[in-house]
Amino acid sequence: MAHKKGTGSTRNGRDSNSKRLGVKAYGGESVTAGSILIRQRGTSVLPGVNVGQGKDDTLFALTDGVVKFETIRRGLRNRKRINVATAAG
């Protein structure tokens, strides 16, 4: 017979690293071309004027300017769009 109690096993104990998603540049902030504006999974926020979209749905600035958010009506639900407004002239 065993003289020690056997140790149990568990099916827990795993966790993934955080992906640091979210808004990186807020409305009114000045950004340079190539700056990451939003890291996201899927298109929660749509790219607007002077904003590009990476293959992982990251939104980034195409030109220097100021970040502007807007809400647009698309179908039955409202969507957010992010633009980069350049300085005129």
Curated annotation (Swiss-Prot):
Protein's UniProt name: Large ribosomal subunit protein bL27
UniProt cross-references to InterPro entries, sorted A to Z: Ribosomal_bL27, Ribosomal_bL27_CS
GO CC annotation terms, alphabetical: cytosolic large ribosomal subunit
HAMAP family: Ribosomal_bL27 (MF_00539)
Family to which the UniProt record says this protein belongs: Belongs to the bacterial ribosomal protein bL27 family.
Organism of provenance: Synechococcus sp. (strain WH7803)
Domain of life: Bacteria
GO biological process: translation
GO molecular function terms attached to this record: structural constituent of ribosome
Keywords associated with the record: Ribonucleoprotein, Ribosomal protein
NCBIfam families for the chain: L27
Region of interest (Disordered), ranges: 1-24
